[in-house]
Curated annotation (Swiss-Prot):
Protein role: Binds and retains class I heavy chains in the endoplasmic reticulum during the early period of virus infection, thereby impairing their transport to the cell surface. Also delays the expression of class I alleles that it cannot affect by direct retention. Binds transporters associated with antigen processing (TAP) and acts as a tapasin inhibitor, preventing class I/TAP association. In consequence, infected cells are masked for immune recognition by cytotoxic T-lymphocytes.
Organism from which the protein derives: Human adenovirus C serotype 6
Comment block on domains: The lumenal domain binds directly to the peptide-binding domain of class I molecules. The di-lysine motif confers endoplasmic reticulum localization for type I membrane proteins.
Name of the protein in its database record: Early E3 18.5 kDa glycoprotein
Gene3D superfamilies in the record: 2.60.40.3530
Keyword match Nucleotide-binding: no
Keywords associated with the record: Disulfide bond, Early protein, Glycoprotein, Host endoplasmic reticulum, Host membrane, Host-virus interaction, Inhibition of host adaptive immune response by virus, Inhibition of host tapasin by virus, Lectin, Mannose-binding, Membrane, Signal, Transmembrane, Transmembrane helix, Viral immunoevasion
Amino acid sequence: MRYMILGLLALAAVCSAAKKVEFKEPACNVTFKSEANECTTLIKCTTEHEKLIIRHKDKIGKYAVYAIWQPGDTNDYNVTVFQGENRKTFMYKFPFYEMCDITMYMSKQYKLWPPQKCLENTGTFCSTALLITALALVCTLLYLKYKSRRSFIDEKKMP
C-alpha cells in the first residue's frame, strides 16, 4: 500500500512538472534615428513562443514599438511572452538618454545626408558632374586628334 501511494505521488509530480512551461528570453533590438530634431526609437523583439507584447512608455505593440524619446522619459521597457495560458514578463533597462544624445549629436555634426536644401544640392552636384564629364570628353578628343596627326607626320618622315 505504501509503494502504491509513493507511485501515485511520483506520477502526480511528473504530471505537474510536465505542465510547467519554460520561457526563453526574447531577442530584442533597439535602434535610434534623428527625425525633425527628435530622437525616435524602434524596439523589435523576436521569440520562439506564440506571442509577445512590448511596452515602452505609453506605447504597446506586438513584436515592435515605435516611440519618440524625450529627456525625462523612463529607460525601462518590458516584454511579455505568451505560451498557451501561461505568460512571463521580462524587464529591460536601456540607456536611451545616452544613445539619443549620441544620435542627435551625430545628426547635427554631419549634415551631409540627406540634403537639407535638396534642389540646390542636387543642382550643384549635377552641374559639377556635367562640367567634369565635358572636360574629360574635350581632353580625350584633343588627345586623339593630336595623336593621329603626330603618327601621320611620323609616317611621312620615315624613308
